[in-house]
Curated annotation (Swiss-Prot):
It is found in: Cytoplasm, Cytosol; Cytoplasm; Rough endoplasmic reticulum. One of its GO terms (biological process) is endonucleolytic cleavage in ITS1 to separate SSU-rRNA from 5.8S rRNA and LSU-rRNA from tricistronic rRNA transcript (SSU-rRNA, 5.8S rRNA, LSU-rRNA). The gene is rps-21. GO terms for cellular component: cytosolic small ribosomal subunit; rough endoplasmic reticulum. This is Small ribosomal subunit protein eS21. Component of the 40S small ribosomal subunit. Pfam families: Ribosomal_S21e. GO terms for molecular function: structural constituent of ribosome.
Length: 88
């Protein structure tokens, strides 16, 4: 949509679920978006530009798989160490 000056305003940008690649619709009120940021150990403040964002759709949350999906994505991105324990 454009205003009288010709500037684009109120443009809806759809998101995709980070886990399932489904498009998160505008009426999916169960979806969440989580940002993980790097923090400076001396000041305790966020380091600008050092963040990882995950969007989880409502369908994944309804199935109870959101915690597993976030853990899998964080392990893939190196935020959480992998648990490579070999069983005997």
């Amino acid at each position: 949509m454009q205003n009288d000056a010709g500037q684009t305003v109120e443009l809806y940008v759809p998101r995709k679920c980070s886990s399932s690649n489904r498009i998160i619709g505008p009426k999916d009120h169960a979806s969440v978006q989580i940002d993980f940021v790097d923090v400076d150990p001396e000041t305790g403040r966020m380091i600008p530009g050092k963040s990882t964002r995950y969007a989880i759709c409502g369908a994944i949350r309804r199935m109870g798989e959101s915690d597993d999906a976030i853990l899998r994505l964080a392990q893939k991105d190196g935020l959480v160490p992998r648990d490579d324990v070999k069983s005997n």
